Design a protein with these regions (language model features):
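N-terminal helix-turn-helix DNA-binding core of bacterial DNA-binding proteins
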Residues: 21-62, 88-97
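Base-recognition residues in the alpha-helical recognition helix of bacterial helix-turn-helix
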Residues: 40, 68-69
Length: 133
């Protein structure tokens, strides 16, 4: 495996740093179990969408709490809403967020795959015996 030069490595790290910055709001939003449940409920509803009352019936939280989580999901660009009369229906729309997260994961994976194994053997042999290998 070719050992990347220091400039190339620093450029890759800079790209990853920028990608983490872009993905942090998405990852933070996804880290909450209630928001995960809401996303799954909305995914199940498909193109029908759901209003706050329907979502509240499926999750043991108050309407204001559900509304709070919906606002966070909407602000993060993971759901969209559509008003029908007096009702607001919510729909999953997580494509952009997932695309950014997938790009980050792939960039990190490519960097890690290109780490020179000889350098690891020489400088950090303990990494080869870690339980996650």
């Amino acid at each position: 495996m070719v050992k990347p030069n220091e400039t190339e490595f620093k450029q890759k790290i800079s790209i990853i740093r920028d990608q983490f910055e872009v993905c942090t709001p998405y990852l933070t939003t996804l880290s909450d179990p209630v928001r995960q449940k809401i996303l799954l409920i909305l995914a199940e509803s498909g193109t029908d969408g759901m209003d706050v009352q329907d979502i509240t019936a499926k999750i043991s939280l108050s309407r204001p709490a559900i509304s709070h989580h919906l606002k966070i999901l909407k602000d993060a660009g993971m759901i969209i809403s559509h008003k029908k009369g007096t009702q607001v229906y919510y729909f999953i729309y997580i494509y952009k967020a997932l695309d950014k997260i997938i790009n980050l994961v792939n960039t990190v994976l490519n960097l890690v795959k290109n780490i020179d194994m000889e350098s690891i053997k020489e400088k950090a042999p303990w990494m080869l015996n870690s339980p996650s290998n």
